Amino acid sequence: MRTINNNILYLICLMPPALVAGPFVADSFVVIINFLFFYAIFKTKKYEYFKHKFFILFLIFYFVFIISSLNSENIFFSLKSSLPYFRHGVFSLAIIYTIDQNKDKFLKIFFRILLITFSVLTFDGLFQYFMGFNIVG
């Protein structure tokens, strides 16, 4: 169980560079984190995370999206764009779960990776401004 929690922790902490890398990498991280989170929750039987007030508020908001999609002219097109939002609510629960499990380690790793990501992007932006081409892409 500890390795699953560590995997969730490191994947969440690697989200800033994943967002820089592109939407495919970031969305893949979110999906993997969600699967690991569901596995950890069902293995430890900690279902109270699904009763969290944030998640209930998200579910209400999500069902408003679904009902609004069902009232549109093109139901399939509307549902296609609103159904995948569920993964973001579960991702938020995974972040809450990770912070509850090991807050100090999470904050330490996350802010170091965030600092490195911002430093690389700042250096790349300055390099691109003065040299005319960028390094990162």
Regions found by a protein language model. Give the residues of each.
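Transmembrane alpha-helices of multi-pass, membrane-embedded glycan-processing enzymes
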Residues: 87, 111-124
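Transmembrane signal-anchor hairpin modules in multi-pass inner-membrane enzymes, especially those
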Residues: 1-80, 97-115
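Phosphate-binding glycine-rich loops of NTP-binding sites
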Residues: 90
